[in-house]
């Protein structure tokens, strides 16, 4: 849930137009840890025009969610269409499995939740928190959620916007633990 909702929260703080979309024809989605979330839209409600005007699609992590998304033809079509039109596609945790199914990791650097790289045949795995490779941004897992969101904000709205959100949320300070 962290890797799905942190980007949504940060994007809304940055005044980005955001819609959460459920793939399964129900507005309520349940996270891999049993937390219910109400999506703004369901996948069949997305028109081709809305997809054409999309600047970014974010695929959250978690299993079996990532597998379910990878097995949904319309999800793969949307990812490919947004990418082919010059939009950004991003995935976190197990989400890069979906990007591979869409053919978007070929010849690209990426990161993912440890162990998922063994299932990804294309692309070049790099063990880092966040990787930005052209139109593709990937992140390792829940602990990378803030960095992931800020990387996407910077790519779409500029460094100043990302810095503003980082300051507002104390993101840059959040990983500094006091030694006792």
Task: Please place each PLM-identified region on the residue numbering.
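Active-site-adjacent pocket-lining segments in enzyme domains
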Residues: 1, 10-22, 41, 46-180
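N-terminal beta-loop-helix "entrance" segment that forms/cooperates
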Residues: 21-42
């Amino acid at each position: 849930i962290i890797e799905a909702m942190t980007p949504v929260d940060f994007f809304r703080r940055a005044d980005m137009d955001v819609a959460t979309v459920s793939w399964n024809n129900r507005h309520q989605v349940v996270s891999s840890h049993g937390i219910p979330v109400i999506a703004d839209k369901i996948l069949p409600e997305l028109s081709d025009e809305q997809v054409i005007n999309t600047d970014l699609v974010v695929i959250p992590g978690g299993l079996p969610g990532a597998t379910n998304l990878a097995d949904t033809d319309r999800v793969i079509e949307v990812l490919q269409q947004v990418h082919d039109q010059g939009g950004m596609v991003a995935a976190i945790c197990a989400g890069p499995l979906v990007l591979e199914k869409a053919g978007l990791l070929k010849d690209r650097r990426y990161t993912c939740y440890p162990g998922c790289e063994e299932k990804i045949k294309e692309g070049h795995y790099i063990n880092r928190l966040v990787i930005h490779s052209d139109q593709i941004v990937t992140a390792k897992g829940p602990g990378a959620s803030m960095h992931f969101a800020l990387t996407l904000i910077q790519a779409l709205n500029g460094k100043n916007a990302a810095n503003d959100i980082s300051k507002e949320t104390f993101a840059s300070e959040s990983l500094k633990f006091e030694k006792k």
